[in-house]
Amino acid sequence: MLVKNIIRALRAERGWSQAALADQLGVSRQSVNAIETGKYDPSLPLAFAIARLFEKSIEEIFDDETEARLAAQ
């Protein structure tokens, strides 16, 4: 599972739209869309904000090993 899919899945679990997530992060809906589609890598402060918001460690969302482990499941 790629980072973009992890964020999309976490957002969907909570029933949040891209706009709702964007509002909580203080970014545009287009930024959330770009992250979810892999067109944009979030800045470090934004990555930490995403992890905090979803109550996950940054490694759970953005770590390459996490992606490989989830893809193998």
Give the residues covered by each predicted segment.
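Short basic helix-loop element that most often maps to the first helix and adjoining turn
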Residues: N5-Q24
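Short linear/disordered segments characteristic of secreted peptide precursors
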Residues: R8, P42, E65-A68
